[in-house]
Design a protein with these regions (language model features):
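Low-complexity/repetitive intrinsically disordered segments
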Residues: 1-2, 32, 165-169
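Structural motif
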Residues: 27-33, 75-81, 125-131
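Residue position within the beta-strands of beta-propeller blades
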Residues: 17-21, 65-69, 115-119, 167-169
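Residue-level detector of Asp-centered blade-edge/turn motifs that repeat once per structural unit
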Residues: 13-14, 61-62, 111-112, 160-164
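Multi-bladed beta-propeller domains
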Residues: 1-5, 36-53, 84-103, 133-154
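Conserved beta-strand position repeated across blades of beta-propeller domains
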Residues: 10, 58, 108, 157-159
Length: 169
């Protein structure tokens, strides 16, 4: 049986694709899918996910990639992945996490579709910090100054300056 998840589908900014979570391969386990709105076969974007997992995903502003947050490789450890919207190999975006269960808490895609900004327990155990990585993978860069174990990064926003540069606050 094919079942759709409670996560609402998203339409790509260019209107070409729908991206959605569906239980289509193994009964009780979800996967992330895309399909051309004009027609065609659905393409699975993620591995089969453990039953009951929620998947947070976003489509890049240029409609080329889907970034998603889920514990795909290690149960109980949410991590960040990027995959071409038309299908292909997914790439883990986050660095090795500081602890188990470390985690990526959330993410934002830059308005230029070039980078992903994310909050994660990365360099210091049990401290959520702000990181940046290219949307197609590579080394992550920590954006905040050193934080002690008493503090975390909770909120942030990404935008463009009048000159077209990315700004994170």
């Amino acid at each position: 049986a094919v079942h759709f998840a409670s996560t609402p589908p998203q339409i790509s900014p260019d209107g070409e694709y729908a991206v959605y979570v569906q239980d289509a391969v193994i009964n009780g386990a979800n996967e992330l899918w895309s399909v051309r709105i004009a027609g065609g076969s659905p393409v699975r974007l993620s591995d089969v996910l453990v039953s009951g997992q929620s998947v947070k995903f976003a489509i890049s502003p240029d409609s080329h990639r889907v970034v998603y947050l889920v514990d795909q490789d290690t149960p109980g450890v949410p991590e960040l992945y990027s995959v071409p919207i038309a299908g292909g190999a997914h790439t883990k975006l986050n660095m090795e996490l500081a602890s188990l269960p470390g985690q990526v808490r959330d993410f934002l895609i830059s308005p230029t579709s070039e980078r992903v900004f994310y909050a994660a327990d990365g360099a210091v155990n049990n401290v959520i910090e702000l990181w940046r990585v290219d949307i197609d993978g590579g080394a992550s860069t920590r954006l905040n100054a050193e934080i002690t174990s008493s503090y975390d990064i909770f909120d942030y926003a990404v935008g463009l300056t009048s000159g077209g540069s990315e700004r994170v606050v």
